[in-house]
């Protein structure tokens, strides 16, 4: 039964018109503290996630996570008949982690390019993007540091990567917005500030090219009905609404699903698109407290569990406009 839990959303109608052969497959995943096992002296989180740190994050545990994560990507490839063209990631320590992940798993067989910048985040985690170099040409990339009350925020940068596909540019934007730690009301203004930054980035791209192709993805730490998403109205289309209306989600808290990982696309980017949430058995574990199933995370508090992430990965399938 669990093996059938692939949640479909026909946001552009049906599968018709989004054939696999001519589609773009994008994957996004919050990797839950994807740290190296060495203490590089980059802050308290880096020290905790080391062989002798509080989390006892050993080489073996790191490679278990790498293997399970690559298994998930390969499952996506098998299910859709192709490897993901783009993989957006968040909660990644640094580019070295990504190189190790690619070099030591089956993902190394694909020539993925890595785009990553170190941010000023307090936890020492960043966003990143992988792209299939056989299908895309690198054009440029940049990061924008969100500001709140006139000061740079100690949070994740917003990553924008422009890639060329068949002579046409596509702008991929990767986000990881502030959490609700400390309370939703108290933390809300910071999420609003980051969302405002995202809207400004998209507006700037659109002003330079009114037919700009934009795909934004990320962990937005809010459900699709959050007021902050009104800032993107008229610029990007939320691909997660139908899933959310059916009660689906990417993270489970106290027995309730929240859909905080999403894709947004500009109207000019595709003639059809739909989003799915990946809930295959090896990424899930039984919820003994609230019944049902939940994501198989790496840690529960300080206790090592052995999974990949407390988030389910999401995929976006699009047929591009010519």
What residues fall within each predicted segment?
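Metal-dependent phosphoester-hydrolase catalytic domains
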Residues: 200-214, 221-322
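N-terminal, active-site-proximal structural segment of metallo-dependent hydrolase catalytic domains
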Residues: 15-105, 115-119, 125, 196, ...
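Active-site environment of divalent metal-dependent phosphoester hydrolases
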Residues: 94-96, 122-124, 180-182, 221-227, ...
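Active-site metal-binding loops of divalent metal-dependent hydrolases
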Residues: 31-34, 92, 177, 218-220, ...
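Second-shell loop/turn segments in exported
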Residues: 52-62, 83-89, 116-117, 147-149, ...
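Active-site His/acidic residue clusters
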Residues: 42-45, 168, 172-187
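Bacterial Sec-dependent N-terminal signal peptides
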Residues: 1-22
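Structured beta-strand-rich core segments of catalytic domains in phosphoester-bond hydrolases
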Residues: 86, 92-171, 177
């Amino acid at each position: 039964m669990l093996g059938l839990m692939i949640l479909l959303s026909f946001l552009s109608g049906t599968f018709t018109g989004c054939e696999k052969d001519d589609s773009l497959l994008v994957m996004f995943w919050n990797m839950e503290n994807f740290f190296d096992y060495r203490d590089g002296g980059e802050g308290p989180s880096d020290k905790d996630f080391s062989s002798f740190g509080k989390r006892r994050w050993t080489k073996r545990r790191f490679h278990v996570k790498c293997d399970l994560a690559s298994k998930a990507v390969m499952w996506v490839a098998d299910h859709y008949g192709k490897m993901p063209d783009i993989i957006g990631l968040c909660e990644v320590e640094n580019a070295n982690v990504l190189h190790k992940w690619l070099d030591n798993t089956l993902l190394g067989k694909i020539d993925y390019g890595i785009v990553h910048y170190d941010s000023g985040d307090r936890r020492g985690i960043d966003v990143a993007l992988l792209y299939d170099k056989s299908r895309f040409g690198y054009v440029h990339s940049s990061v924008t540091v969100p500001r709140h009350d006139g000061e740079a925020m100690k949070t994740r940068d917003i990553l924008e990567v422009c890639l060329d596909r068949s002579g046409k540019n596509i702008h991929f934007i990767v986000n990881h917005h502030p959490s609700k730690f400390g309370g939703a009301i108290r933390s809300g203004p910071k999420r609003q500030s980051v969302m405002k930054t995202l809207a400004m980035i998209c507006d700037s791209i659109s002003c330079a090219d009114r037919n700009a192709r934009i795909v934004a993805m990320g962990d937005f730490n809010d459900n699709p009905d959050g007021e902050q998403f009104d800032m993107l109205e008229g610029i990007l289309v939320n691909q997660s609404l139908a899933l959310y209306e059916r009660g689906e989600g990417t993270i489970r808290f106290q027995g309730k699903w929240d859909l905080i990982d999403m894709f947004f696309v500009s109207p000019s980017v595709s003639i059809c698109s739909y989003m799915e949430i990946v809930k295959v058995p090896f990424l899930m574990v039984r919820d003994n407290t609230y019944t049902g199933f939940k994501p198989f995370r790496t840690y529960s508090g300080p206790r090592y569990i052995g999974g990949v992430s407390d988030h389910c990965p999401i995929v976006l399938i699009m047929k591009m406009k010519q």
